[in-house]
Amino acid sequence: STHCISSAASDVYKRQAEWDHAARFFWNTVVNHRSVCIGGNSVREHFHPSDNFTSMLNDVQGAETCNTYNMLRLTKMLYQNSGDVDNSNKPDPRYVDYYERALYNHILSSQEPDKGGFVYFTPMRPGHYRVYSQPETSMWCCVGSGLENHTKYGEFIYAHQQDTLYVNLFIPSQLNWKEQGVTLTQETLFPDDEKVTLRIDKAAKKNLTLMIRIPEWAGNSKGYEITINGKKHLSDIQTGASTYLPIRRKWKKGDMITFHLPMKVSLEQIPDKKDYYAFLYGPIVLATSTGTENLDGIYADDSRGGHIAHGRQTPLQEIPMLIGNPDSIRHSLHKLSGSKLAFSYDGNVYPTQKSKSLELIPFFRLHNSRYAVYFRQASEEQFKTIQEEMATAEQKATDLANRTVDLVFPGEQQPESDHGILYEASETGTHKDRHFRRAKGWFSYNLKVKEEASQLMITVRQEDRNLSLIHISEPTRLGMI
């Protein structure tokens, strides 16, 4: 399939320049400052501070699929009008870089391949897992958008503009470009194989330009080694930024364009520059399985919060920590032979793995398992101190989690809705990067209870500590605070 770059949607942007500026500012902020390696964003459906991704690494309610669904819709619209913004009359391939990253690593990973269930939250907490919807129990927002997500893998592969065809994504496909009388077939096993072949099955007798995308992760055009009908195509494009390589000629039936994508292993630090890193191969995020135990509720029931992975949270000190500097860590990951992507890490790892090395595969292929996408990195000198600090913090967090019957985050829409919020003359806001609800009148929640529950823990401002704040309704009265 293909789109025309001048669309009704982009016409709206042309008429509303201030909207266009706001949309691009939002896109740049989310993509470059608030997104993790899979292209997703947010914790508990809210943006955390852009300079602190701690909650993303700790919380089990990680990147929401609907957010990425909408970011891809916005990306497509901005791409279609991007040439008008800088007066280049050419679309900006940086939008395709993000689209590709989010498509392969978040969207493709959000459907369970056996039963077809959809994912609501994708935790980035190392050692946790995802929950999958079921037809009779789960009609979440991420099921509705999920039904759309997996029908749209073909919509962004190509774009056209007058007599120019843009090849954006490397996905097996056939294009019928009716306006120019061209039929083209793309053959590839990407990302398992670097080879891409474009075959002209039908062509009109006129000059047309083929624009082949050179992604940012490819480095420069030298690695492409483009051949046309077996003869090397020379190009003087040298860039580390995303761009297009133009080939203009009078195409004929049977013409074959072949190139190899220069994919390599890279190490990407979490955006707030904590010592957590993810491995990528080209644009593909890699992950390791950390076990299949205690996957409580992996297939969602119809309970409140059935979309959340409520099972045991693996203590972070039990997750593989990579010992060494980032450069040595990157060079310790090696591609294995075989038809499917797989990698072996032979560097220094703590805790020591049962097998001799750590095995990683594309995240989108890792299902029905706990996993780690981000890994803690430490030098030899930092290692012992970090272990002690993590063990102390994790013990406190684990003790609290094991004692917790229910949990609500005041001022956050979905947690409050899930807990039956009622209020009168109440307002919400944020203070020091935390959401709050203020009771000028009153507000209430419905909380789960257990007979053995004996405490209610709340967070209040220091100046409010001595006020009479909480009433617990009968028949379960824990006391007055």
Where do the protein language model's features map onto the residues?
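Single conserved hydrophobic/aromatic residue that forms the stacking wall/gate
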Residues: 2-9, 13, 470-471, 478-481
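Well-ordered alpha-helical scaffold segments within catalytic/enzyme domains
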Residues: 4-16, 55-59, 70-87, 197-202
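C-terminal beta-rich recognition modules with glycine/proline-rich loops and embedded aromatic residues
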Residues: 23, 97-105, 110, 114-199, ...
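A short beta-strand element within beta-rich, extracytoplasmic domains
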Residues: 209-216, 451-466
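Carbohydrate-binding/catalytic loop surfaces
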Residues: 1, 7-10, 40-64, 115-139
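A surface-exposed beta-strand-loop module
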Residues: 225-256, 263-271
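Extracellular and analogous surface-interaction loops
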Residues: 198-206, 437-439, 443-454
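Short, surface-exposed beta-strand/strand-loop-strand elements in extracellular ectodomains
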Residues: 221-230, 467-477
